[in-house]
Design a protein with these regions (language model features):
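N-terminal beta-strand motif that seeds the catalytic metal site of vicinal oxygen chelate
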Residues: 1-26, 82-87, 133-142
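Short, P/G- and charge-enriched loop/turn segments at secondary-structure junctions
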Residues: 3, 70-76
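Core segments of cupin and vicinal oxygen chelate
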Residues: 16-63
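Vicinal oxygen chelate
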Residues: 20-23, 79-129
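Active-site beta-strand termini and strand-to-loop segments that position acidic
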Residues: 47-52, 122-125, 135
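Short beta->alpha transition motifs characteristic of CBS
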Residues: 59-60, 121, 132-139
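A short, acidic/glycine-rich surface segment
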Residues: 65-72, 139-141
């Protein structure tokens, strides 16, 4: 672990592909690979039952765009991400400031989602939609 880090990642909150064709992705991940997904009314497939991951989800691009920009289409001037990755951190606000001071363009800053998560998002150099978050459900003792 690097001692000079400016922020502390507590754990990987979740990851998965950002999908363009939900049917094809459902067929691969659920039907062929046997992933135990819960399916929401809007077609969002997610699982908190895959060992080694707090959450694995197939996130439709339109839903990622809605979360980041408040509309169903991804902006043409920002590369479309292929996958998402979220890290839970001590302080989303501090982590956001550290990332911005490092030159990262935040797409969303300190947004509170309906399920209680606080998140900031940016595109990584590899083209991933990266979130730094505080996810209360993942912090509760089981």
């Amino acid at each position: 672990m690097q001692d000079s880090a400016k922020l502390k990642v507590l754990f990987i909150a979740g990851f998965g592909p950002i999908v363009r064709d939900t049917g094809e992705s459902r067929r691969l991940y659920r039907d062929v690979l046997g992933m135990p997904f819960k399916e929401e009314a809007d077609g969002y497939l997610h699982s908190e039952a895959v060992p080694g991951a707090k959450s694995f989800a197939l996130w439709p691009l339109s839903q990622a765009a809605q979360s980041c920009f408040g509309k169903d289409s991804w902006p043409k001037d920002i590369p479309e991400p292929q996958a998402w990755l979220e890290f839970d951190v001590d302080s989303v606000e501090k982590a956001t400031a550290v990332l911005e001071s490092g030159g990262y363009r935040m797409l969303v800053k300190n947004k509170k989602e309906p399920w209680g998560q606080i998140v900031s998002r940016f595109i990584s150099p590899e083209g991933l939609l990266v979130g730094i978050s505080f996810t209360p459900a993942f912090r509760e003792q089981k």
